């Protein structure tokens, strides 16, 4: 027989024929009782939590399965956390996270805090993450104010140990393919008949496709390798294309990470570097990411701790945009052959809809790159005045640069059945080139006073008082030109005619005061109160402060 209870060590008891009255005593599970959970601006014992906080051991997740992004990997790991992806394009993390549903008509995404500072899940190498906490209710989120109205996700990255130096390498090669292919109608004659039926069902008097084309396709499909009057194979002149098969293919993901960690009584450190190459499942959508992290903490004296948490990354993406795959597939038609003899196919049937086209042709008409550069560093110090009282000072600097450069590529479309070029090669004078450049930087100054003491072994008291200043500057410019001298000279300066130009800039600042008081009697009776006072430069100077508090919770 097995006896278990939350907070106690499970006990196995052997039952025999001579067993009568049983007296079972369970021992407290000290590891569980002492387990701490990351909360806003600190940690708390799990048994003393008053709010709804879930903790995910993310390091274990990375050991059991390939993970390309942190946000997509959170799906199914915590009750109340919903994760849905709007795009599977490599490097484009469109995963939408919702904590306990949608809480507002505007931005409903949770606030993301990485190592104590606001950040983006895109900026984290999954193998650098140690633990993730999800704050779900008002009690746990109030310390962050109005920004936390939709929940908070707290990410804690790995740190070094005080043991000897260790070197770890993790390498993985995986294969990526669509889990469920969209079933496309590849028999074009059947497609034409169904389209005619749909027209009749909505009361239209005329069919979309003439019966002679339906009969022609059925006849030519019986001999796909035969030649038409222009010497073109029937399977090209009268195609039955499955566009799901043409557009999607298997891709390879290379993921390599190297870390060095260790330390002594005075210092501990973790240095890591990562490389990921994701080919994608659609042409012209590949993505490469390079990242590095340095987490260093030193104790020059017993009362002083200093250190840094620094992260940098660069992500390069191809410019193929397949984020809305359904629209691409809706515009396709089985009566178009994808590519032959250096040209992209065009719908062969004269009765085909004007919106029908060749998705490969659309993907191939642009080339270039998208580049995302991130740099984030936090310098921190901790001074212990007494065993129970400490002061934390944190300074964070964050820099983000996004750059896109695109240019037109000569390509043309041919109706293969008769060799007519429908959309000719664009001359260099009409080819366009463009760039987008976005840059923002921010800094955060933070001061925290922490107090924690246990009286008479049963009265656990802790308090936090904090002050924070935040400033952010944003700048964007974009422009497009056409008229290249030669298609191989596709830099922006090489074009002759400006077609568009624009830009914008913005900056704002916030100032915040916040605090928290916790009391626990014998880890059974709990009390917590939070407050926050925020000021923003976006409001009028007389209305720039707002007060947010969370009622006391026994």
Regions found by a protein language model. Give the residues of each.
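Residue-level signature of outer-membrane beta-barrel architecture
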Residues: 157-159, 262-264, 275, 298, ...
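Residue-level detector of conserved catalytic or cofactor/ligand-binding positions
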Residues: 546-554
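Exposed, low-structure sequence patches enriched in small/polar residues
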Residues: 394, 466, 516-520, 530
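Surface-exposed loop/interface segments of Gram-negative outer-membrane beta-barrel transport/assembly proteins
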Residues: 32, 90, 162-239, 280-376, ...
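Repeated loop/turn-to-beta-strand initiation elements of outer-membrane beta-barrel proteins
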Residues: 266-269, 303-306, 388-391, 459, ...
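Short, small/polar-rich motifs associated with maturation and membrane association
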Residues: 1-293, 298-300, 305-307, 313, ...
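Structured alpha-helical segments in the cores of large, soluble enzyme domains
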Residues: 256-262, 511-521
């Amino acid at each position: 027989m097995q006896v278990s209870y939350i907070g106690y060590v499970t006990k196995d008891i052997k039952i025999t024929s001579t067993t009568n009255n049983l007296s079972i005593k369970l021992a407290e599970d000290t590891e569980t009782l002492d387990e701490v959970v990351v909360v806003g601006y600190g940690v708390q014992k799990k048994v003393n939590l008053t709010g709804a906080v879930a903790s995910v051991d993310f390091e274990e997740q990375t050991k059991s399965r390939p993970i390309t992004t942190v946000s997509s990997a959170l799906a199914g790991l915590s009750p109340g956390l919903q994760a849905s992806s709007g795009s599977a394009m490599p490097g484009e993390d469109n995963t939408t996270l919702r904590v306990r549903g949608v809480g507002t008509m505007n931005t409903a995404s949770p606030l993301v805090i990485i190592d104590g500072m606001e950040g983006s899940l895109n900026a984290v190498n999954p193998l650098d993450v140690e633990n993730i906490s999800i704050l779900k209710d008002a009690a746990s989120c109030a310390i962050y104010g109005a920004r936390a109205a939709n929940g908070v996700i707290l990410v804690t990255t790995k740190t070094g140990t005080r043991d000897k130096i260790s070197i770890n390498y993790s390498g993985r090669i995986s294969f990526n393919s669509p889990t469920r292919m969209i079933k496309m109608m590849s028999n074009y004659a059947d497609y034409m008949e169904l389209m005619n039926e749909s027209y009749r069902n909505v009361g239209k008097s005329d069919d979309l496709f003439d019966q002679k084309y339906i009969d022609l396709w059925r006849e030519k499909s019986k001999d796909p390798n035969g030649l038409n009057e222009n010497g073109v194979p029937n399977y090209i002149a009268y195609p039955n294309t499955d566009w799901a098969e043409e557009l999607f293919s298997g891709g390879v993901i290379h993921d390599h990470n190297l870390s060095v960690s260790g330390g002594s009584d005075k210092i501990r450190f973790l240095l890591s570097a990562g490389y990921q190459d994701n080919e994608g499942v659609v042409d012209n959508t590949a993505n490469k990411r390079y990242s590095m992290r340095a987490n260093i903490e030193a104790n020059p004296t017993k009362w002083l701790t200093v250190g840094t948490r620094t992260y940098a990354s660069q992500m390069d993406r191809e410019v193929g945009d397949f984020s809305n795959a359904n629209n691409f597939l809706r515009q396709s038609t089985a009566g178009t052959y994808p590519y032959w003899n250096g040209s992209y196919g065009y719908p062969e049937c004269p009765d085909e809809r004007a919106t029908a086209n060749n998705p490969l042709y659309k993907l191939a008409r642009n080339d270039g790159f998208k580049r995302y550069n991130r740099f984030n560093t936090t310098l921190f110090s901790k001074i212990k005045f007494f065993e129970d009282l400490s002061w934390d000072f944190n300074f964070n600097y964050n820099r983000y640069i996004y750059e896109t450069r695109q240019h037109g590529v000569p390509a043309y479309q041919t109706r293969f059945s008769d060799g007519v070029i429908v959309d000719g090669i664009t001359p260099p004078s009409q080819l366009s080139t463009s760039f987008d450049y976005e840059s923002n930087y921010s800094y955060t100054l933070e001061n925290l006073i922490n107090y924690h003491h246990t009286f008479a072994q049963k009265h656990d008291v802790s308090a936090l008082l904090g002050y924070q200043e935040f400033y952010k500057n944003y700048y964007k410019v974009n422009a497009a030109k056409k008229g290249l001298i030669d298609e191989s000279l596709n830099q922006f300066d090489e074009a002759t005619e400006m077609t568009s130009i624009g830009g914008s800039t913005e900056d704002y600042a916030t100032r915040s005061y916040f605090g928290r008081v916790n009391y626990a009697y014998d880890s059974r009776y709990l009390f917590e109160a939070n407050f926050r006072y925020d000021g923003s430069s976006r409001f009028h100077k007389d209305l720039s402060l707002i007060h947010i508090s969370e009622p006391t919770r026994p």
